[in-house]
Amino acid sequence: MAAPPLSSWPWASLGSYKYVLYGAVVWKVAEEWRQQGAAPVGSWWLHLLLLFAARGLTYQFWFSYGNMLFFTRRRRVVPDSVDFRQVDAEWDWDNFLLLQTLIGATLVGSPAVARQQLLLPSLKQAWDPRGWAIALLLHVLVAEPLFYWAHRALHRAPLFSRYHAAHHHASVTTPLTAGFGTPLESLLLTVVIGVPLAGAFLMGVGSVGLVYGHVLLFDFLRSMGYSNVEVISPRVFQAVPLLRYLIYTPTYLSLHHREKDSNFCLFMPIFDLLGGTLNHKSWELQKEVYLGKNDQAPDFVFLAHVVDIMASMHVPFVLRSCSSTPFANHFVLLPFWPVAFGFMLLMWCCSKNFLVSSYRLRGNLHQMWTVPRYGFQYFIPAAKKGINEQIELAILRADRMGVKVLSLAALNKNEALNGGGTLFVNKHPELRVRVVHGNTLTAAVILNEIPSNVKDVFLTGATSKLGRAIALYLCRKKIRVLMLTLSSERFLKIQREAPAEFQQYLVQVTKYQPAQNCKTWLVGKWLSPREQRWAPAGTHFHQFVVPPIIGFRRDCTYGKLAAMRLPKDVQGLGYCEYTMERGVVHACHAGGVVHFLEGWEHHEVGAIDVDRIDVVWKAALKHGLTPA
């Protein structure tokens, strides 16, 4: 069956190459620049580009604000997060901006317009208050009712299923949802936004300022409504009751998206009142949301840290197109590096741990908090005390909130820093929150990656917490472990922990040469290209080193960091954890999830209990977590 007209975008097959369509406008600006010998500041072609950029930034501003959960968590209308399904559905949310820019370009380039200056004011006329008055009048008397009745029509069969249903695909709105729609809906919005401008221009009172002001104010209010965060105090409506019929709120719009049979207005609820479609719960719910009654304490917390400056921008409140895919050094982020560097200095001086993202698993709220410290800072001796204080504050805060389990990420559980979390458990024996380093499951993931026919392995980082557990586990399986360490004392201490009949399988080596015939390398310490050359062709590098080693050898294979895929029934997950694929989390994160799901009452800190490796692994599989 053929798709209904104006239900799909003509440039859908172009993907990101759709932005080439802006080329004609860019070329016109460049041509005028060449002819004038200077920037064409009085060019409508230039204004089209500037307006497009300003509009995109408006939506991005509200999107970023709405996803700064450390600011907005308590005032979110729908507390759930956006999932990958919604991210993909709204990927081309800016199609309407492209459409309206092309319509504007057609208008500017029209011979009739160029000849008669129809609709286009003099560029010297930057401001005319009469134009603003006319535009406001036309917005209230024409644009608002036009949108209201068209919107109601789109909610009737068959228009809803053919055109508008996709816009209602999710109950969690974001400013990007505002732009997501079919060409028909976008053309309708173009008419709605254009009527006040056209009226003012035809009456000879248009201005450049009116174009920018009207369009950007329209986008600002639309983004605000879709932000899913209450920003207007209920006291304002109590002081001026009439105002509730003149401006909508995010709660007002959210009710429309969830219930679909009320609150159809553009910005002014008075049209719902006149049309009999006003949801009278709107302002009571708005008050509850603004006062934080919609807030919920998490059940599980994963306490992460920032890796580096580029990775600091891989968060849900920067660019969703980046944070919803595995981390990479996207070129679009490079211009913002100085800004990110400034924020690093600011966080070093005066920040505390903050909420980054959340998801739900089987009705329980899981959150990721971040310690405001970067990877390099963990190796500065003078910073050790401050980092531990940040981690301790996070643990105590979680304890007060009633969190059941808090899992420590990567460097937050460094042995030299806090003994794998033992520092906090010993200092606060009365903790109700269970502190978990997650390394038991990390060890299990690494061990279960090793083929069953392997007879010997080469282990770097051999005397670390993970290295010790891996060595002791493998020797019980009668697998010879070449443990790279210069410390005979630390090696012998680990060897004595093994049962007497298996101690012979633990072998100390101090150089890489003994491993040149071993094709299974377990990497717990960084390997340089020179050190990797000792591995024979066909070697597989299993990794538990942060950051992971760089794969220089083309004749070898490189494993990723230990990770597990969350169960299929996870909800509201729309953020990739660092370099992990969608739906995949680091094994230490997954270890905390398993600890919570099992309801275990013990802290998992300090040395890894080798006897629990298989127990934790089986529990993870039982709950639906799978190897990534």
Curated annotation (Swiss-Prot):
Aldehyde decarbonylase involved in the conversion of aldehydes to alkanes. Core component of a very-long-chain alkane synthesis complex. GO terms for molecular function: aldehyde oxygenase (deformylating) activity; iron ion binding; oxidoreductase activity. It catalyses: a long-chain fatty aldehyde + 2 NADPH + O2 + H(+) = a long-chain alkane + formate + 2 NADP(+) + H2O. Homodimer. Belongs to the sterol desaturase family. Its EC number is 4.1.99.5. Disulfide bonds: none annotated. It is a multi-pass membrane protein. Residues 137-277 form the Fatty acid hydroxylase domain. It comes from Oryza sativa subsp. indica. This is Very-long-chain aldehyde decarbonylase GL1-2. Keywords: Endoplasmic reticulum, Lyase, Membrane, NADP, Transmembrane, Transmembrane helix.
